[in-house]
Amino acid sequence: MSEPIRLTQYSHGAGCGCKISPKVLDVILAESGTQALDPKLWVGNASRDDAAVYALDDERGVVSTTDFFMPIVDDPYDFGRIAATNAISDIYAMGGDPLMAIAILGWPVNVLPPEVAREVIRGGRAVCAEAGIPLAGGHSIDAPEPIFGLAVTGVVSKRHLKRNDTASAGCQLYLTKPLGIGILTTAEKKAKLRVQDQGLARDWMCTLNTPGSRFGKLDGVKAMTDVTGFGLLGHLVELAEGSGLTAHLNYAAVPRLPSVDHYLAEGCIPGGTLRNYDSYGHKISALSDDQKHLLCDPQTSGGLLVAVAPEGEAEFLAVAAELGLKLSPIGKLVERQSHAVEVI
């Protein structure tokens, strides 16, 4: 009997941990030319937001995003589900609703059977169906490593559009999914994942960030982004710095997956963790190793980071509870201080 195929053994990276580090990305983009100004482009790349938004008319905009990566789990169907969930998340993070998706597939056709790729596509299609959108087509190439993701198109009302650089002082910070996805998936890749922890990270990664669409309609939500490959600290730096503020982050209040401490002790630290710290560490107060390893852990299909004004908190928490989310604040935004993020 042949051994089951372990997709993670065919890639050098995993999930959003494959991202080029922000430090290197800055070099790539610095001399690549400037974008011509277009007043209809409501959101471009200036603030490294989750998606681009282009005006359809004075009230509505089309939301466009793409996201793809190498396998973060061994099962091909789950890989497809996770990649699709992660890609669609960007639409929700802007406060929008997805309309359709196009698949992006790279496959080592001389190494892995096409039937395995078929399972990846099947997983992606299942998530699109769950989100209520068609997987309308796609493009594929012969590639040295498996790659899958989506280009997703959505729509958003201008008054409900949420950006990552529009928070205000006094906003409370909320996170809708626990951290530690990169740590547990690294444990799986190293064959160190305990039986009782199997499926924990997968289930979170396959949970759509649909609450973002509802949060977008709340005036008390001042800024929103999803936490992915740059870790909570990286995305929080971008939110705080972009808004001209400092975030006070309560480390003890940050939700995390069970057994994170066990796997950190086993050395299950993704390579992206240290790349994230190298890119953002100078903008953050001093951290212990444990804080660094959790807060810089690259998330794949992570949760929504939401900045909520005090006057809107009650309504926000009521909507969150209605959607099955039991949330507590993990920090607060204050007037700008010496660091973009102070961990307390």
Curated annotation (Swiss-Prot):
GO terms for molecular function: ATP binding; magnesium ion binding; selenide, water dikinase activity. ATP binds at residues 19, 47-49, 67, 90, 138-140. Disulfide bonds: none annotated. Pfam families: AIRS (PF00586), AIRS_C (PF02769). The record marks 19 as: Important for catalytic activity. It catalyses: hydrogenselenide + ATP + H2O = selenophosphate + AMP + phosphate + 2 H(+). The keyword Kinase applies. CDD domains: SelD. It comes from the Bacteria. Mg(2+) binds at residues 50, 90, 226. GO terms for cellular component: cytoplasm. Its EC number is 2.7.9.3. Its cofactor is Mg(2+). The active site is at 16. Binds 1 Mg(2+) ion per monomer. The keyword Transmembrane does not apply. One of its GO terms (biological process) is selenocysteine biosynthetic process. Keywords: ATP-binding, Kinase, Magnesium, Metal-binding, Nucleotide-binding, Selenium, Transferase. Belongs to the selenophosphate synthase 1 family. Class I subfamily. Homodimer. Synthesizes selenophosphate from selenide and ATP. This is Selenide, water dikinase. It comes from Pseudomonas putida (strain ATCC 47054 / DSM 6125 / CFBP 8728 / NCIMB 11950 / KT2440). The lineage of its organism: Bacteria, Pseudomonadati, Pseudomonadota, Gammaproteobacteria, Pseudomonadales. The gene is selD.
